[in-house]
Amino acid sequence: MVKFKHKTDKRDSNLRQAFIKLLLKHPVRDVKFSGRKISLTFFGHRLSDKIVSLREPHVAEWSRRRKEIFIDKKISTNDRRKSFKALCVHEVIEKFLTEHFGFRTDKESHIIATQKEKEYLKYLGGNWESHELIVYWDWHSYGEH
């Protein structure tokens, strides 16, 4: 009986990894910003959330209760507009994957969302290294490590 459970766990793990690889290859489409909302299509699902700009110690976060994402107000300035948009894409996708597929936020959803954030930033003509520095210094300005 123990061997059977082990084989099932291994098979489930392999299927999960294959699904993650599939999601990593799947593009984000039709990204639109309208007022304080973002909408996009990912993996055949139309997703939308309200964007709230406030003091956010984790740079960006998503609500577990409402259709909202939170982006630190320092990132929403005009000189950081591309980073702001890329972070919005990241949060919407991370929220969707965690809620819809039950992925672990830090180990699975975050990896996929970061890849989609990077792809979208490249599409906007942004620089990934500059974006990472903006996020890094914003995160550390609140004493996070």
Each language-model region and where it sits:
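Intrinsic-disorder-driven secretion/translocation and chaperone-binding regions of pathogen effectors
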Residues: 1-3
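Metalloprotease/metallohydrolase-associated module, dominated by Zn2+-dependent proteases
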Residues: 5-82, 99-145
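Active-site recognition of the HExxH zinc-binding catalytic motif
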Residues: 86-98
